[in-house]
Amino acid sequence: VNVPEPVCFVAPAGHPLADKAEVPLDVLAQQEFLLTERGMSYRDALDQRLAARGLSIHPYIELGSASLLCQMVERGMGLSFLPEYIVRPALSAGRIARLNVPDCTVTMHRQLFYHKDKWLTPQMKAFIELVNQ
């Protein structure tokens, strides 16, 4: 199983950047950020893309919980860079806005490996189905 998972920049609804058609990466790097801890795959991907352009983001909060970061963005505490599956409900409800940053797109991959010739229990089949959603 190999499912692409986009990662996106998000801002609180009503943030000045939320209405912009595009946000340049250098403008974004000047904002207050809430990010996941270093070592998480999508955080590392962001840091690498920023470094390649001579930029960096110095978050004022780093947490291990992407869900909690999304809630903090909803409450207007800053911007973040999170997997789309985490922010989708808040985006749909209009509580946060996805920022269009064309010079920094990141897609991670949700992967699950299993032996194709081995018998799969009903629980394993259900788990594979869940990962594919």
Regions found by a protein language model. Name each.
Residues 19, 99-133:
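A late-sequence structural motif
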